[in-house]
Amino acid sequence: MNWFGSNFFRCPEDLSLLNIYSPLLSHMSSEDEHFISNLRGHVPASAVVKQPVRGASGRTTITAIVQTGGGWSTGLFSVCRDRRICFCGLFCPMCLECDIARHYGECLCWPLLPGSTFALRIGTRERHKIQGTLCEDWLAVHCCWAFSICQVARELKMRTSQVYEICAVPMTKDTLV
């Protein structure tokens, strides 16, 4: 039986790739031989008993949305409710959309992507639990794009969210359970 046949039926624990002699390895430089011999003689690493802790700094930030539920605070065509948003939406709707993307922590290039306004509107509706459907959002964005951006901006301005920072005391001793 050849080498493959005799080693094929052995237990995987008995067979290590580092213990196999290969004729291809005989043409290696002395530096490579030294590296391979060190690997063959290397003792397996011990198990990790201490795992890294997420948020090792001890600080956690929690955003609490105070007002949720219901419908949109203003209608789609209620642009005159907030003059700043009205003028920004009229003269530079992309700037207003960049402001909304910044509010969500997205890149300022976000409004250049197709469907970004639709995603921002759905994100606002889902985050604040505003009643509505995807079909209504799609129609508002694709038929009344500038009005839709203004409505989302007004909603984000009217709905409040508070940011809390919680400090945790780090554990001093790790124990195995």
From Swiss-Prot:
NCBIfam families xrefs: A_thal_Cys_rich
Family assignment from sequence similarity: Belongs to the cornifelin family.
Protein name: PLAC8-like protein 1
